[in-house]
């Protein structure tokens, strides 16, 4: 458990990117939603 917590924490040099790293896993979901909206716009052809 401690090893996973240690790996999950970014090194101090990269602390400024911490909020960005929290958001990055969500980006593929936006692409999935975009594909759905695009298909809805063209009528699911």
Curated annotation (Swiss-Prot):
Transmembrane feature ranges: 24-44
Keywords (A to Z) from UniProt: Membrane, Photosynthesis, Photosystem II, Reaction center, Thylakoid, Transmembrane, Transmembrane helix
Protein topology in the membrane: Single-pass membrane protein
Principal subcellular localisation of the protein: membrane
Compartments where found: Cellular thylakoid membrane
Record propeptide residues: 1-8
Name of the gene encoding the protein in the UniProt record: psbK
Protein task: One of the components of the core complex of photosystem II (PSII). PSII is a light-driven water:plastoquinone oxidoreductase that uses light energy to abstract electrons from H(2)O, generating O(2) and a proton gradient subsequently used for ATP formation. It consists of a core antenna complex that captures photons, and an electron transfer chain that converts photonic excitation into a charge separation.
Subunit-structure text: PSII is composed of 1 copy each of membrane proteins PsbA, PsbB, PsbC, PsbD, PsbE, PsbF, PsbH, PsbI, PsbJ, PsbK, PsbL, PsbM, PsbT, PsbX, PsbY, PsbZ, Psb30/Ycf12, peripheral proteins PsbO, CyanoQ (PsbQ), PsbU, PsbV and a large number of cofactors. It forms dimeric complexes.
Highest taxon listed in the record's lineage: Bacteria
One Gene Ontology cellular component annotation held by this UniProt entry: photosystem II reaction center
Family the entry assigns: Belongs to the PsbK family.
Organism: Rippkaea orientalis (strain PCC 8801 / RF-1) (Cyanothece sp. (strain PCC 8801))
Protein name: Photosystem II reaction center protein K
Record-level GO BP terms: photosynthesis
């Amino acid at each position: 458990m401690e090893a996973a917590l240690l790996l999950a924490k970014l090194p101090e040099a990269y602390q400024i990117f911490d909020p960005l790293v929290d958001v990055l896993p969500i980006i593929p979901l936006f692409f999935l939603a975009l594909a759905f909206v695009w298909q809805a716009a063209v009528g699911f052809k």
